[in-house]
Amino acid sequence: MLKITNLSAQVENKEILHLISFDFQSGKNYCILGKNGSGKSSLAMLITGNPKYEITDGTIELDGQVLNEMSPDERARAGIFLTFQNIPEIPGVKLFEFLKSIYDAKAETPSTFLSFKKIIEPLMQELEIPKDFLWRDLNVGFSGGEKRKIEVLQIKLLNPKYIILDEIDSGLDVNAVRQVAELLETTNTPDNSFIIITHLFEMLQNLPLEQVLVLEKGVIKQV
């Protein structure tokens, strides 16, 4: 369970969340709604450990383990995954290198070139991602839909416990939104949970939701 208790936080001495409490149950999906500036993305940043965001009160726990002082990498290894609103392009880093590095960070022993190739290529085939993408610079020249497919590929590869989708529909046309939603459905299992931050209900049609939270000015107004 991802448990948030009396969480307050600030950025540059400005309060952004005030006494937020909620339990995200394992294996269930949730949606967070709210206007721009309501605190939706701030909550995602706090869960994943973005150092720009300062917790002033309360705790974030994952399966009984307090995350407050853990680094973003430690939280990722514990099972937290975040998609980005604006996916960065990283020239000089091949997709294969990036995927292997994040896989090895969670593995007990590092994979070899050939062993990882055998792991990643079937997953790419499932998502209809061309194999030659592995040897391209990370996200450079990729369309919005292709970048989102790479994020779905990471979810399949890492099997995180809690997957936070922060405006994953950003920059996508209607057809691409529908396609990404269908791909996400294939990654949703009884062992993981999606926390979806979105304005578009198309993203919600393929995933069964347990609850919808409404944030307003850093406070939960409706559940």
Feature map (PLM): residue ranges:
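Helix-to-loop junction immediately C-terminal to a conserved catalytic motif
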Residues: 48
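Walker B catalytic motif
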Residues: 167-168
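H-loop (His-switch) and adjacent beta-strand-loop-beta switch element
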Residues: 208-223
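Q-loop/switch helix immediately C-terminal to the Walker
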Residues: 86, 92-106
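ABC ATPase C-loop
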Residues: 155-156
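Conserved structural motif at the start of ABC-family nucleotide-binding domains
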Residues: 2, 17-19
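ABC ATPase NBD Q-loop/coupling interface
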Residues: 59-75, 139
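The feature captures the beta-strand-to-loop junction immediately N-terminal to the Walker
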Residues: 33-35
